[in-house]
Amino acid sequence: MSQQSTAVKVFDHTQLNDTHTPQQVIVELMKLYYTQGWVSGTGGGISMKKDGKIYIAPSGIHKERIKEDQIFVMEQDPEVQVVDIQSCQHLKTVYSPNDNGYNFKISACQPLFQLCYDVRGAGAVIHSHALSAMLATLIYDKEFKVTHLEMIKGIRGHGFYDELVVPIIENTAFENELAGSLKEALEKYPNTFAVLVKRHGVYIWGKDWVEAKTHAEVYHYLFDCAVRMKQLGFDASSKQ
């Protein structure tokens, strides 16, 4: 007599689509970005917004090992006015993994993710600690600039001949202290979908997780390209 298999159906990031929950998307993208060095050493993170709810991974744990029931779920409290953008006091918890026996803190990136939602209408945000992003902040001062590179087309509203500009803000000792300068950059650069943080990494977003993923892959390619062109004596901000 044959036994019926009770194995759980397994999928990975290559099969993600709109039928998957935000928790499933975050878990799979974390695994993918860990292999690319974007969220190693417990750093970096991903957040998504869907149907009025905000999904955020916990802080200080290995991102490639995050499980679906470890994702915080928040929503905006309409009765609370935003006074301090660092505290996110206008958000209330819908689900906490600590209700299931965990002892986690929500990602320290929460105020930065929330700014991308509030100021830019993002649907998903990726925070990367990729080496290429960090190095790019060392070869540019206040703005990362590239032009005449084919991959620029992958950023919404940009083309091959355009100058793609990404603002660079100064790093701080604690993530939430970036809120003020990030808000200023979001308002000053309406055409960007990324903000670099000096000697740290980058925040990248899109209208949903699909566009955020596309933007993240394109920006990281351009960061790496600019660094390598610099090593070869070329200027990525020039068409020459």
UniProtKB/Swiss-Prot annotation:
It comes from Naegleria gruberi. The active site is at 150 (proton donor/acceptor). The keyword Metal-binding applies. GO terms for cellular component: cytoplasm. Its main location: cytoplasm. This is Probable methylthioribulose-1-phosphate dehydratase. Zn(2+) binds at residues 127, 129, 200. Its EC number is 4.2.1.109. Pfam families: Aldolase_II. Catalyzes the dehydration of methylthioribulose-1-phosphate (MTRu-1-P) into 2,3-diketo-5-methylthiopentyl-1-phosphate (DK-MTP-1-P). SUPFAM superfamilies: AraD/HMP-PK domain-like. It is found in: Cytoplasm. Substrate binds at residue 109. Keywords: Amino-acid biosynthesis, Cytoplasm, Lyase, Metal-binding, Methionine biosynthesis, Zinc. GO terms for molecular function: methylthioribulose 1-phosphate dehydratase activity; zinc ion binding. Pathway: Amino-acid biosynthesis; L-methionine biosynthesis via salvage pathway; L-methionine from S-methyl-5-thio-alpha-D-ribose 1-phosphate: step 2/6. NCBIfam families: salvage_mtnB. It comes from the Eukaryota. Its cofactor is Zn(2+). GO terms for biological process: L-methionine salvage from methylthioadenosine. Binds 1 zinc ion per subunit.
